[in-house]
Amino acid sequence: METLSFDSSALKKFVHPNELGEMQAMVTAADSELRNGTGAGADFRDWLHLPTDYDKDEFARIEAAAKKIQADSEVLVVIGIGGSYLGARMAVDFLHHSFYQAQTAADRKQPLVLFAGNSLSSSYIADLIDVIGDRDFSVNVISKSGTTTEPSIAFRVFRQLLEDKYGVDGANARIYATTDRQRGALKTEADAEGWGTFVIPDGVGGRFSVLTAVGLLPIAVSGADIDQLMAGAAKAEATYVNPDLTQNEAYQYAAYRNILYRKGYTTELLENYEPNMTMLAEWWKQLAGESEGKDQKGIYPSSANFTTDLHSLGQYIQEGRRNLMETVVKLAEPNHNVKVPSAKSDFDGLKYLEGKEIDWVNTQAYRAVVAAHTTGGVPVMTVNIAKEDEFTLGYLIYFFEVAIAISGYLNGINPFNQPGVEAYKTNMFGLLGKPGFEEIGEQLKKEMDD
């Protein structure tokens, strides 16, 4: 099959064919805003041509740094949160063995890529230190500013660990900072200490940054082919340029989401039938939620892992509130297949499946779920992908990025800012006693005591 295809055939009872056509003028306008820079947030559109217009010299430095880390480290600790975490984590999970972390070094062949700075759990940090043990390791700290609380705390911990193990000079040779090109606390410290540095481009927001050094260095260290990742994204960039809805499946997805949203389907479940796509949904949730959830509107992004979650969420999806729509990422060709074996006893009633490939069973489950859920009043869309490889992943990343950008403009918002994330941070800094936030902290404590 082709690398990616979008299937809207299960929407027939929910969307009249004329409705998609009526969206064309709005989609064309949204496309113009995106490509001509006339829409809100225009300064953050550099991801749009990133698959073909990127810094080739930096790309070569990323590949060289990855080889060095592979040569001198058994573990790479990637420190970041949000877009500085989810893209790389998603790709490592998507492209590697389902039990990647449990593989032996000989089987894995490349360093184990682990993640920190994505929570404030002290137990997680302690456990990660325990897992690293006496193995050689390097650190990739990712932050535009260098002052984001979670990664900054984690970096202090792992920098100290490096210095205790290798000395200051040895530690500095194992630290790689992905940060602003010219300014910020992390950039200043990196230049002073001589760390290897890579750039977070000014015109690329965190949730759109997986195809920059933010994602590419950890992905390359894991042993994945980042040239193929970029090639897949470049193919998608070339594919999704025509705003004609009969020709552009990414724009179809954006249009259908908005049609359904306006009919009251306000929550979208991104679903998969492969466990190693769990983090794909986490990455997508930030991409969609942070792009669209503003001005008291927007589709709420959620996720489910099938068939597992059919045994927990299945009842609600089938008969709960009718505010759900589903988008399934369906894999056509798994990396491995296993057949249902024959057995002496048919105590489990599976004789009728003997000799069948488990992936075939998985596909029939998917077909049955689509039929049941649409009958129950839940619209279902499917994004079919050919394989779990780098080219396909790059293509899929770009599909979702351009679709979400168009979807945001269709809903009349700026898809590239995130002003709402500052509210909790201001309160947290007040409660932590950060200089400059004391008054806020005192007010909050008073309110909480009352």
From Swiss-Prot:
GO molecular function annotations of the record: carbohydrate derivative binding; glucose-6-phosphate isomerase activity; monosaccharide binding
UniProt family annotation: Belongs to the GPI family.
Chief localization: cytoplasm
SUPFAM superfamilies xrefs: SIS domain
Known function: Catalyzes the reversible isomerization of glucose-6-phosphate to fructose-6-phosphate.
Top-level EC class as recorded in UniProt: isomerase
Subcellular locations according to the entry: Cytoplasm
Pathway(s): Carbohydrate biosynthesis; gluconeogenesis; Carbohydrate degradation; glycolysis; D-glyceraldehyde 3-phosphate and glycerone phosphate from D-glucose: step 2/4
EC number: 5.3.1.9
Classification via InterPro entries: G6P_Isomerase (IPR001672), Phosphoglucose_isomerase_CS (IPR018189), SIS_dom_sf (IPR046348), SIS_PGI_1 (IPR035476), SIS_PGI_2 (IPR035482)
GO BP term, pick one: glycolytic process
Catalytic activity: alpha-D-glucose 6-phosphate = beta-D-fructose 6-phosphate
Active site (UniProt): E290, H311, K425
Protein name per the record: Glucose-6-phosphate isomerase
Record has Ligase as a keyword: no
GO CC term (a single one): cytosol
Keywords assigned: Cytoplasm, Gluconeogenesis, Glycolysis, Isomerase
